Amino acid sequence: MRTLDGRYRLEQRIGVGGMSEVWRAYDQVLDRPVAVKLISPGRDDRDGPVDRIRAEARSAARLEHPNVASVHDFGTSSTWPGRPVPYIVMELAEGETLAVHLRAGPLDWRIAVRVCAEVAAALAAAHAEGIVHRDVKPANVMLTPAGVKVLDFGIAIAAGEPDPMPTGMVLGTPAYLAPEQLDEAPATPAADMYALGVLLYYSLTARLPYRAATASELLLVRRRQPPEPLPDIAGLPPEVAELCHSCLADDPEQRPTSLVAALLLAEAVDARVYVPMTIPTSRRSAPTSPWTERAAAEATEAVAVAHEPNLPSAR
């Protein structure tokens, strides 16, 4: 087994992306399991990937929230053969991703809504810090026995910052990109809210709100056709369906904020979520109720309470 800087013993590779690997590891100093993300060995040492993984560490380290996988450390190891490798040490979230659960079909609407409430709460914490995730999707949502963990702020960026990629290239997953992202507009929290709408739609139906066979066809359909309306789902509160529709609005100004979405979705399943103390006053187009308004006003250190139905447990 390899050890990074004499401290982090890499035990098992648990994920591989286009520019990085994630390993289950062991912190030999603090005597605990951790996750380590590092640039994939064998990739050429270009500044872009290195800068992005450093940015991920800095962005995620600013977030202290129960639905965000916390960052413990960042470094550059000289012990990897061939070249120095930057790495991030993160909380090891035990469970399965939402993508894995959705392979079996749609979730019960109560579970889907609760999952998305916790995702929205994580986004609200990020947005309160001026951070846009930019890659909200089922593969980046981990379902653990204790609740949801939003993973991989690897392409996160400060709200309003231009995309660092070359002209004509956009980072993100095509099905979850907001219309303005396709036009290379600066990242804003509203882009994350579009992705949340797709995530909610997919969790409720196990399909995307667009019909396409390939990624290129998907991008073409995205530009020519609006998202398909959410089908009728027995028992689903109408305000949840309306929220999903609002999140998928072409106009970013018509989408609800992450704070409003988190509170509305939590109310729909009688759950509670951690939300930022600072309450945005703009772009509150989603319907709210007295409970939601009261919760927002009183949310100083909200307690996360697990209500039935429980999240799917790790298999």
Spans of model-derived segments:
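Protein kinase catalytic-loop region centered on the HRD/HxD motif
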Residues: 119-131
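Activation segment signature within eukaryotic-like protein kinase domains
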Residues: 115-116
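Conserved short submotifs of the Hanks-type protein kinase catalytic core
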Residues: 81-97, 101
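Conserved catalytic-loop aspartate of Hanks-type protein kinases
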Residues: 192
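Protein kinase glycine-rich loop
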Residues: 11-17, 22
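AlphaC helix of the eukaryotic protein kinase fold
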Residues: 40-62
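Activation-segment/catalytic-loop signature of the eukaryotic protein kinase fold
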Residues: 74
